[in-house]
Protein backbone atom coordinates (compact mmCIF):
# COMPACT_ATOMS: atom_id res chain seq x y z
CA UNK A 1 0.00 0.00 0.00
CA UNK A 2 2.80 2.43 0.89
CA UNK A 3 4.56 1.62 -2.38
CA UNK A 4 1.38 2.28 -4.34
CA UNK A 5 0.93 5.65 -2.60
CA UNK A 6 4.56 6.56 -3.32
CA UNK A 7 4.19 5.56 -6.99
CA UNK A 8 1.03 7.62 -7.30
CA UNK A 9 2.74 10.65 -5.73
CA UNK A 10 5.76 10.25 -8.01
CA UNK A 11 3.53 9.93 -11.08
CA UNK A 12 1.66 13.09 -10.10
CA UNK A 13 4.90 15.01 -9.48
CA UNK A 14 6.27 13.94 -12.86
CA UNK A 15 2.88 14.52 -14.51
CA UNK A 16 2.79 10.93 -15.77
CA UNK A 17 -0.59 9.52 -16.63
CA UNK A 18 -1.56 6.01 -17.60
CA UNK A 19 -5.10 6.95 -18.60
CA UNK A 20 -6.18 7.34 -22.21
CA UNK A 21 -6.55 11.09 -21.78
CA UNK A 22 -4.50 13.22 -24.13
CA UNK A 23 -2.73 16.37 -23.10
CA UNK A 24 -0.20 18.70 -24.58
CA UNK A 25 3.36 17.43 -24.54
CA UNK A 26 5.55 18.99 -21.86
CA UNK A 27 8.26 21.47 -22.85
CA UNK A 28 10.93 18.97 -21.85
CA UNK A 29 11.81 15.37 -22.32
CA UNK A 30 13.17 12.97 -19.75
CA UNK A 31 15.88 10.46 -20.54
CA UNK A 32 15.85 7.05 -18.95
CA UNK A 33 18.03 8.44 -16.16
CA UNK A 34 15.51 11.19 -15.44
CA UNK A 35 17.74 14.09 -16.44
CA UNK A 36 15.77 16.99 -17.76
CA UNK A 37 16.44 18.17 -21.30
CA UNK A 38 14.63 21.40 -22.14
CA UNK A 39 13.19 22.25 -25.53
CA UNK A 40 14.30 25.60 -26.91
CA UNK A 41 17.93 25.11 -25.89
CA UNK A 42 20.97 23.88 -27.80
CA UNK A 43 23.42 21.40 -26.27
CA UNK A 44 27.08 20.47 -26.64
CA UNK A 45 28.37 16.92 -26.53
CA UNK A 46 30.42 17.98 -23.47
CA UNK A 47 27.14 18.68 -21.59
CA UNK A 48 26.78 22.46 -21.70
CA UNK A 49 23.54 24.14 -22.75
CA UNK A 50 22.95 27.42 -24.59
CA UNK A 51 19.86 29.60 -24.59
CA UNK A 52 20.12 32.07 -27.46
CA UNK A 53 18.24 35.32 -26.91
CA UNK A 54 19.39 37.00 -30.12
CA UNK A 55 22.31 39.21 -29.16
CA UNK A 56 23.16 37.35 -25.93
CA UNK A 57 23.46 33.62 -25.20
CA UNK A 58 23.18 32.16 -21.70
CA UNK A 59 25.39 29.14 -20.94
CA UNK A 60 25.36 26.54 -18.17
CA UNK A 61 25.88 22.83 -17.61
CA UNK A 62 23.10 20.36 -18.21
CA UNK A 63 21.05 18.46 -15.68
CA UNK A 64 22.73 15.30 -16.98
CA UNK A 65 26.18 16.76 -16.20
CA UNK A 66 25.29 17.96 -12.71
CA UNK A 67 23.75 14.58 -11.95
CA UNK A 68 27.00 12.82 -12.82
CA UNK A 69 29.10 15.36 -10.93
CA UNK A 70 27.19 15.11 -7.68
CA UNK A 71 27.00 17.95 -5.18
CA UNK A 72 28.74 21.04 -6.60
CA UNK A 73 30.83 22.77 -3.92
CA UNK A 74 32.83 25.36 -5.89
CA UNK A 75 32.63 27.12 -9.26
CA UNK A 76 35.35 29.14 -10.98
CA UNK A 77 34.10 31.42 -13.76
CA UNK A 78 35.68 34.14 -15.92
CA UNK A 79 35.06 37.84 -15.42
CA UNK A 80 32.86 39.96 -17.67
CA UNK A 81 34.87 41.09 -20.69
CA UNK A 82 36.75 37.79 -21.03
CA UNK A 83 36.79 36.09 -24.44
CA UNK A 84 35.65 32.49 -24.78
CA UNK A 85 36.26 30.13 -27.71
CA UNK A 86 34.05 27.32 -28.92
CA UNK A 87 35.28 24.10 -27.31
CA UNK A 88 37.69 25.92 -24.99
CA UNK A 89 37.48 25.81 -21.20
CA UNK A 90 36.14 28.96 -19.56
CA UNK A 91 35.99 27.75 -15.97
CA UNK A 92 35.61 24.71 -13.79
CA UNK A 93 33.20 23.05 -11.42
CA UNK A 94 34.35 21.25 -8.29
CA UNK A 95 32.04 18.64 -6.84
CA UNK A 96 32.33 16.07 -4.10
CA UNK A 97 33.38 13.60 -6.83
CA UNK A 98 35.69 15.55 -9.16
CA UNK A 99 36.79 18.84 -10.67
CA UNK A 100 35.68 19.30 -14.27
CA UNK A 101 36.37 21.93 -16.92
CA UNK A 102 33.42 23.82 -18.35
CA UNK A 103 33.76 24.24 -22.11
CA UNK A 104 32.15 27.02 -24.09
CA UNK A 105 29.75 25.77 -26.77
CA UNK A 106 30.22 29.07 -28.67
CA UNK A 107 32.80 31.83 -29.14
CA UNK A 108 32.28 35.37 -27.93
CA UNK A 109 32.69 37.89 -25.14
CA UNK A 110 31.41 37.29 -21.61
CA UNK A 111 28.95 40.09 -20.81
CA UNK A 112 27.63 38.78 -17.49
CA UNK A 113 28.60 36.20 -14.87
CA UNK A 114 26.23 34.56 -12.39
CA UNK A 115 27.78 35.89 -9.18
CA UNK A 116 25.28 33.91 -7.06
CA UNK A 117 27.26 30.76 -7.84
CA UNK A 118 30.29 31.91 -5.84
CA UNK A 119 28.17 31.96 -2.67
CA UNK A 120 25.72 29.19 -3.59
CA UNK A 121 27.31 26.76 -6.06
CA UNK A 122 24.58 24.21 -5.28
CA UNK A 123 22.24 26.22 -7.54
CA UNK A 124 23.83 24.23 -10.36
CA UNK A 125 22.38 21.07 -8.80
CA UNK A 126 19.00 22.43 -7.79
CA UNK A 127 18.31 24.60 -10.85
CA UNK A 128 20.79 23.96 -13.69
CA UNK A 129 18.67 25.71 -16.34
CA UNK A 130 17.38 28.67 -14.34
CA UNK A 131 19.23 29.89 -11.23
CA UNK A 132 22.32 27.80 -12.01
CA UNK A 133 23.24 29.47 -15.32
CA UNK A 134 26.93 30.39 -15.48
CA UNK A 135 27.74 33.07 -18.05
CA UNK A 136 26.09 35.23 -20.67
CA UNK A 137 28.02 35.68 -23.90
CA UNK A 138 27.73 38.03 -26.86
CA UNK A 139 28.35 35.51 -29.69
CA UNK A 140 31.09 36.40 -32.17
CA UNK A 141 30.07 33.63 -34.59
CA UNK A 142 26.30 33.05 -34.29
CA UNK A 143 26.53 30.27 -36.89
CA UNK A 144 28.29 28.12 -34.25
CA UNK A 145 24.87 27.62 -32.66
CA UNK A 146 23.79 25.63 -35.73
CA UNK A 147 26.42 22.97 -35.01
CA UNK A 148 25.04 22.26 -31.51
CA UNK A 149 22.66 19.43 -30.66
CA UNK A 150 18.90 19.85 -30.44
CA UNK A 151 17.10 18.28 -27.44
CA UNK A 152 16.36 14.97 -29.19
CA UNK A 153 19.94 14.52 -30.40
CA UNK A 154 21.33 15.49 -27.00
CA UNK A 155 19.05 13.00 -25.23
CA UNK A 156 20.23 10.27 -27.62
CA UNK A 157 23.86 11.31 -27.03
CA UNK A 158 23.38 10.98 -23.24
CA UNK A 159 21.72 7.58 -23.55
CA UNK A 160 24.52 6.27 -25.78
CA UNK A 161 27.20 7.70 -23.49
CA UNK A 162 25.60 6.21 -20.37
CA UNK A 163 25.28 2.81 -22.06
CA UNK A 164 29.08 2.54 -22.27
Swiss-Prot record:
UniProt keyword terms in alphabetical order: Cytoplasm, Lipoyl, Mitochondrion, Transit peptide
Record flagged with keyword tRNA processing: no
Cofactors, names only: (R)-lipoate
Residue interval of the organelle targeting sequence: 1-34
UniProt domain Lipoyl-binding: residue ranges: 56-138
CDD domains recorded: GCS_H
GO BP terms, alphabetized: glycine decarboxylation via glycine cleavage system
A Pfam family: GCV_H
Source species, domain of life: Eukaryota
UniProt remark on cofactor binding: Binds 1 lipoyl cofactor covalently.
Locations listed in the record: Mitochondrion; Cytoplasm
InterPro entries: 2-oxoA_DH_lipoyl-BS, Biotin_lipoyl, GCV_H, GCV_H/Fam206, GCV_H_sub, Single_hybrid_motif
GO CC annotation: glycine cleavage complex; mitochondrion
Family according to the record: Belongs to the GcvH family.
HAMAP family: GcvH
Function: The glycine cleavage system catalyzes the degradation of glycine. The H protein shuttles the methylamine group of glycine from the P protein to the T protein.
Protein name (database record): Glycine cleavage system H protein, mitochondrial
Organism of derivation: Oryza sativa subsp. japonica (Rice)
Lineage of the organism: Eukaryota, Viridiplantae, Streptophyta, Embryophyta, Tracheophyta
Amino acid sequence: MALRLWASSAANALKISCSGATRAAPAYSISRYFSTVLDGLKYSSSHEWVKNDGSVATIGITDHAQGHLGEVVFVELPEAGAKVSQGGAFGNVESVKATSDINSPISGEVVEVNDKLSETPGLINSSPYEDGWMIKVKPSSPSELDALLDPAKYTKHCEEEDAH
